[in-house]
């Protein structure tokens, strides 16, 4: 299997912004569903599958290719069965940015159909401006895989309040030498999730126009729930602005940023973890010293990428009475996206409350 970071580093070279991108083409499309048929949607992961289900309800049949909570979409290798599911789908929803490259590979092989993509590479269209994500052009440009047709005008822009200013076109960074402004884990960016729900509702409405209003209302309800999560994150930011945290992997980067927290993880450590190499003795010593000096109020820990090094970080934090907050990469079984995020946001809030 390929390295979980190799695909991401290739696809993210030159990634300028997170945005929702929409693709629709005629070649190879599945016939539109009948008025009483379920719309077949393939999602790359159960995270995006949960968003689709919230918007589509009983009108959709959602197939998430990566649904095992312990699976790693970075290195997932698609099967002929996966390709057949994509071919048979009316709509495909995926993350992009190299995170779920297997979907992009299938789509690139001729299965061209309407898609909603959560990450937009600068090579695929105009850069999108999010307030605080950097000074970039205003709206995502709809784009396609090679051979895809043009689409109507781009969706209206949304701002990211509370995100730090970043350059419009950052230097190329993969996960080897990861820059914190470039991160494909956009489901931790609640605003992007809001945009994805909007686009899903739009595409479902095109497939079944008689239910377009139903999808719009469902998206509105989902977005209200996401908005409530944003409110909770805003409360965290108001009470904890600038407080330092250490992360074992920046999977929750956008949430940490929105919460007003300062990631003080030594860059040498981050670069090694992201490149899936063992951190140098100096990097390990640097993060150990930071923890021993209690230079962070919490450690954000991804148990799904646990290694002896990260376990030692966790142990050191616990020995120094520094709160450890688990934030995972994939959706736990039996939980919706909103339930999952709510649980993690509450855990972060509780940990920070311990340091007041």
What spans do the regions from the language model cover?
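Extracytoplasmic metal-acquisition and chelation regions
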Residues: 2-356
